[in-house]
Regions:
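Acetyl-CoA-dependent GNAT
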Residues: 5-11, 15-91, 102-108, 112, ...
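Conserved catalytic-core motifs of GNAT/GCN5-like acyltransferases
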Residues: 118-122, 129, 133, 138-154
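Extreme N-terminal starter segment of soluble prokaryotic enzymes
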Residues: 1-3
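Short amphipathic helical patch at the helix-1/turn junction of helix-turn-helix
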Residues: 88, 122-123
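Conserved G/P- and acidic residue-centered "switch" motifs that form tight phosphate/ATP-binding loops
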Residues: 96-98
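A generic structural signal for beta-strand entry/edge sites
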Residues: 78-80, 116, 152
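Conserved short alpha-helix immediately C-terminal to the canonical SAM/SAH-binding motif I
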Residues: 101, 125-128
């Protein structure tokens, strides 16, 4: 199992993985194109390309020629990076691959000199929150955005001294 930097030409492949990985979340929380048009379950290659144009770096997890997941890292400030689009295909879950992707971007953020990594999740997704807590993240705050049908929980993890 390898994790490598994704290229812009792989945006369609990344979008396919993201859509497939987030489909169950959309179904569980009733998220549709009408209620949550920017939810990752609706991700397109154009979205991934625009993110890359803004400086978001994507990483692809592969087992030989078969991709099993991806993750993105955005440098928000010199001290803070955002972990985004963590996606593991359903048939590859519960094998430690999500943690491997998170560990990879934590190391990349450290290499950039960041002091903290943050993420936003569906606040009602308790299992995901608990998983991030086990990885050393802590809840920062929960915010309700007018354009979203769910509250967002922001979580963060300090990088210095871990």
């Amino acid at each position: 199992m390898a994790i490598r930097l994704a290229t812009r030409e792989e945006a369609p492949r990344l979008a396919d993985i993201i859509r497939a990985a987030f489909r169950d979340v959309a179904e569980r929380f009733g998220l549709t194109a009408e209620t949550a048009p920017t939810h990752p379950s609706l991700c397109t290659a154009a979205w991934v390309g625009r993110a890359m144009d803004k400086g978001v770096t994507y990483y692809l997890g592969e087992d030989g020629a078969r991709a099993w997941g991806c993750i993105a890292l955005e440098r928000a400030t010199p001290d803070v990076c955002y972990l985004e689009r963590l996606a593991v295909l359903p048939e590859f879950r519960r094998k430690g691959l999500g943690k491997a992707l998170v560990d990879h971007v934590l190391n990349e953020a450290r290499a950039l000199g960041a002091r903290r990594v943050e993420i936003g999740i569906v606040a009602a997704h308790r299992e995901l929150k608990d998983w991030y807590l086990r990885l050393g993240f802590r809840a920062i705050k929960t915010v309700r955005f007018e354009h979203l049908p769910f509250a967002v929980m922001f979580m963060g993890r300090a990088l210095q001294g871990d």
